[in-house]
Amino acid sequence: VVVGAGLAGSAAAYSLAQRGWRVQVLDAAVAPAAGASALPAGLVAPHVSPDDAPLSRISRAGVSTTLARLAALLPAGTDWAATGVLERRVEHARALPPCAPGSPNPMDGWSVEASPERLAQAQLDQLQPATSALWHPCGAWMRPARLVQAQLAQPGIEWRGACAVARLQPTPEGWALFDAHGQTLAQAPLVVLAAGFSVRGLLASADGAGTQPSTESGSPLPLHALRGQVSWGALNELPAAARAALPPWPVNGYGSFLHGMDGPSGAPMWIVGSTFERGNTSAAVTAADHAANQARLQRLLPRLGTLMQPAFQAAQGWAAVRCTLPDRLPAVGVLDAVRWPGLHVLTGLGARGLTLSVLAGEVLAAQLHGETWPLEPRLAQMLLAQRFSRRSKP
């Protein structure tokens, strides 16, 4: 049983079903991708650091795995497109890692300094002081809900909506899952908790401690809530001058700007965001966050931000609560095999769910089956949830 039907849960279910498991996916919502994975559109792009840190290398593995999954399951140009992504660092330059003469460059095919022509296409070439940016030729945009739906539609997966899991209880055969009224929802030898921030409460219930630990520090998995809001609107409602200033591909680096894909209404849209607010668990759309997104766009693409300012007065919005972990990496697989045998997690993806969820599902399945890791073994070990149970033991 997988609890959670967003990017994390659907990726876990897909990877297990591909290996012959019969998987039930339970979610409190009546439709898949109802939480953070309902983002209208978002970016898949690598993280870059001057020392090519583990997060950067993990992100490249995530991009590669995600693009392969998108190509296999979704129509290109409709639900995703490998357009490339321009990354403009507003607050500080994002340097590429150095490459010793004669050594292979780890960034080949991934990221290069943006050319003057690309800066001109984004109308960034005349800024003072001069701006710099990176070009990610492998970058893409995607509609995450479409990937969730496609993964859950695979043979061997049964989707069950309106099944809010409130409590777990160990049984001789594995685990029983109950709703808030004590009704049994499912029983299984293996359970994957992929319900975002709700994983904290479900882990507490597995110990018989109710569903809400009193503090984040009291949870064996130190998840933190991270609220985000994006602003979006119809592309054809923008002034002609704003439409003429649109970059030909997505831009990120201080929030992000995308345009051209179909929005929830079916018409081509623009989308800006997202905000980041730690500790806030409200999914209400606010005018303050629309203003914050407009300010981000103003700094990311100054001319376009000025031209689009009136559009934010009528902008629509989407907000959700994601969750992160202190080391900014997801938690995947077994958390504590002695304390919770047969209980696995896939959570803590934060703002990188689009880039890392497919890879995380493959890591979970590889751990279960004793397979070769889908990325460097040392990097795979950094994703395993058991790193937190090891830290908590004397």
Regions found by a protein language model. Give the residues of each.
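Active-site substrate-recognition segment that forms the wall
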Residues: 1, 8-19, 28, 36-48, ...
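Residue-level detector of alpha-helix initiation sites
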Residues: 6-7, 351
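Conserved beta-strand positions in the Rossmann-like core of class I SAM-dependent methyltransferases
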Residues: 24
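Dinucleotide-binding Rossmann-like beta1-alpha1 core, especially the glycine-rich loop
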Residues: 42-131
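Short beta-strand to alpha-helix junction loop
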Residues: 53-62, 92, 133-150, 284-289, ...
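C-terminal catalytic lobe of FAD-dependent flavoproteins
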Residues: 138, 305-394
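A conserved short coil-to-beta-strand element within the FAD-binding core of flavoproteins
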Residues: 161-175
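Core beta-strand elements of the Rossmann-like FAD/NAD(P) dinucleotide-binding domain
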Residues: 181-190
